[in-house]
């Protein structure tokens, strides 16, 4: 009898354990009909314990199946695949966007006509530049000279986001101040963007000038850069709610006609209520103070790009980055972020003279307190900007002939003629080395 009661208690324990497991796993209990249950070795007449047993009586329910069974158990291999609830939905969305992008892969707009182009029709000429995200080469496609930017894919989500942003933003933009995209090719391991070819970026020009001991960017060239860059940034904000976030000398390009255009939208962002949120996007030496401060780093607006443009222009006209650089980049960024330390100013420049308007304009761009720094539309009303805006009428300083900004183009040609190509690879002291 004791053995019978022990087995009864064991069955009760199994029932409780089974119920606990089903509740914990969120499963629905499967109940077996009485005729489907397999009997154990206990005879039916011993289903109940004697009243003399020391254990309390428990009436076993008639329709609860066993968790265990005398039958041989089957072992199911453990699956290592994530359940649907644990899938990386962000990466799934990126992969879906790539699949959608394949639909337009190979369709290029050449001389105003959309053409389906085979990748084998890309004939590479030479390397124009390289960076952490890929390479840019000159090439011909159906006799059209263009630049081909190749970006390599991997499983990193930030890498995929950067490629998709660059493709998406370049495809949607139509501005004379932004490098034109003709289309793209998508492959399993890379993406190629075919775009308008430019002659040189400001960073390479600055290196040529420095090592050839030429005069740095003159004020009228800086004015043309300011006008073109702010026009491009304002277009991005007003038409597409985009903030560039990576303004620096290497992303401002010249062509032979003196036109200036922005490029590289891999870390650009779409703004919500005119605010951006990403904390890490951008090149730290050119980041605005508010983006380097913990308290304000969660949100910022286009005025951060105004600061980046100010630092860039200061560097172009003086030949030097305006903050001390050393092995500890943290120290440099701390100086930038410290609102109690003065901002750089051309007023302190003694080697060259600049107009009061230019000095005042750059001082506005380099206000450390973001609340005192103007946005694009405010800067576009400043007299220095108007001096280089063709729409300003009599205030405009240049006369464009046949689409060519003569003075800027002449200056550019002289720099190329008087400097050496190999100087583009040489660094400049106290200047950030960025890609």
Swiss-Prot record:
EC code: 2.7.12.2
Domain of life of the native organism: Eukaryota
Binding site for ATP: 128-136, 149
Tissue/organ expression: Expressed in most neurons, including nerve ring, head ganglions, dorsal and ventral nerve cords and tail ganglions.
One of the record's GO cellular component terms: perikaryon
SMART domains in UniProt: S_TKc (SM00220)
Listed transmembrane segments: none
Cofactor: Mg(2+)
Primary location: cytoplasm
Stated family: Belongs to the protein kinase superfamily. STE Ser/Thr protein kinase family. MAP kinase kinase subfamily.
Name used for this protein in its record: Dual specificity mitogen-activated protein kinase kinase jkk-1
Lineage of the species this protein comes from: Eukaryota, Metazoa, Ecdysozoa, Nematoda, Chromadorea
Gene: jkk-1
